[in-house]
Amino acid sequence: MAGRQPVAIVFDTFGTVVDWRSSLIAELTAFGRKRDINADWTALVDAWRAAYHPSMDRVRKGEQPWTTLDGLHRASLDKLVAEFGIKGLSETDLRHINLGWHRLNPWPDSVPGLTRLKRKFIIGPLSNGNVSLLLNMAKHAGIPWDMIFGSDLFGHFKPDPETYLGVAKLLDLEPGQVMMAAAHNNDLANARKQGLMTAFFARPSEYGPHQKRDYAADQAWDVVAKDIEDLATQLGA
């Protein structure tokens, strides 16, 4: 990449760094088999993710008090378990299932690419996940973050400006010294509005057969890469 380079690179996490869909489907399918609970776990995972943005929007609009993503995930799970007619789950079971979001697996290029980038840049997630979720995920997946920027540090979810600008403030950097990396064009558009640099790489299988967008960059982002390892190469890491 010619020209200016960032001091820090922050990454969207769900879908960008980790494969939430395949991870949860595999874990819940194994859980159901072990417990002899028959359910359409794939459909449940897709419905659970579909509840993600609407639940956060209720918080962002002030329709409900600040709630961590763990809390929002749990409220959505409770509703879906009832809707899917899944019986026999204890509170311990429900908590275990909800914490599946803490045990997501990385895409194959994520850890190698981040390890390279870490040698040259400050790296961390800028995610709607809470700090404990992202910390546990990093431990599970071996993700080598320098710092974890969870939504509960800011009391805001993306795309609120407080998230993007909050990273720069915490790192004592100007927004233009921070790069937002994501597999979602809308995330990058919101980051760019706040003055951040941007990097895009596609995750065309994030939503499985339900993927409808983000197959390619839809703007001239500062960097367009194949994946995180290619991002590292383009940034000279």
Spans of features found by a protein language model:
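Short phosphate-binding/catalytic loops that engage adenosine nucleotides
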Residues: 107, 119-122, 196
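Asp-based, Mg2+/Mn2+-dependent phosphohydrolase catalytic module
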Residues: 1-9, 111, 115, 126-237
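Alpha-helix boundary recognition
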Residues: 49, 102, 115-118, 236
